[in-house]
């Protein structure tokens, strides 16, 4: 088999979805709508939290960072896919593919860590309510988020740099709509043992460990909640319900993607699972957090009311 290194190859082909032009047009409209809803929804969450001083608490600080990470995570893959569908092109350069891999891993890991920080915040609030303001002080929250960013970037950089040492075969077709790291490794002609070790290491440290932290936090929360009154239980579960829904959606779809790709060759099923993971989950997060949260709904309503009043005032002045 002919061999070539990454500088000689230059381009990958993202096979993506259906070849039928009518189906491509339908998918373009669907994915563009989902992307816009994701961006607008998460931006509204960020603006709502930043504009309301009552929401300047650790929980909403982590939530605003999570919304920003979701915007970046979706923007890593979806715009390129939309451009490829629009232009009927499947090509992505090697540099573009590496860039996509780097940001995909970085923001995916950041999502993991921020979900863990939010679970820890709920754990402290419910299990140690009298010490909550002392433990979850602004300095600690800032350090936790900064540390999450640094760890995510370093883990992503480590995994991305190991791909640079690989040589690739002449078959440069990726059976996906973005540069999935595991699919890129399958195209390599050179030994990928080190790459697989690094990938498993990053997955365990930045995926499995955070999930274990979330499970531990909620085991402690449930243990504490069972000892309080029914009213206290309802309040605790309503507080944690949104976060649990997001965690279940994020890890459930993520696990579905990699189990389906590991058990069977890439198919429409695995592509659908990837769409759930990369697009549907970030799109639904703002709805889950806002619809189940009275404070968020109230603040969002006031924000939209101020925006409407400002618009009407501007129109009145111009007329």
From Swiss-Prot:
Tagged with keyword Cell membrane: yes
Identify the glycosylated residues: 5
What terms describe the molecular function in GO for this protein? G protein-coupled receptor activity; olfactory receptor activity
Q: Could you list this entry's UniProt keywords, alphabetically sorted.
A: Cell membrane, Disulfide bond, G-protein coupled receptor, Glycoprotein, Membrane, Olfaction, Receptor, Sensory transduction, Transducer, Transmembrane, Transmembrane helix
Q: Which residues lie on this side of the membrane: Extracellular?
A: 1-25, 76-99, 161-197, 258-270
Subcellular location field: Cell membrane
Cellular component GO terms held in the UniProt record: plasma membrane
Membrane topology type: Multi-pass membrane protein
Q: Which cysteines are joined by disulfide bonds?
A: 97-189
Query: Key word Transmembrane present in the record?
Result: yes
Where are the membrane-spanning stretches?
A: 26-46, 55-75, 100-120, 140-160, 198-217, 237-257, 271-291
The similarity annotation says: Belongs to the G-protein coupled receptor 1 family.
Task performed by this protein: Odorant receptor.
Q: Which PANTHER family match?
A: OLFACTORY RECEPTOR
Return the protein name. Answer: Olfactory receptor 7C2
Q: From what organism does this protein derive?
A: Homo sapiens (Human)
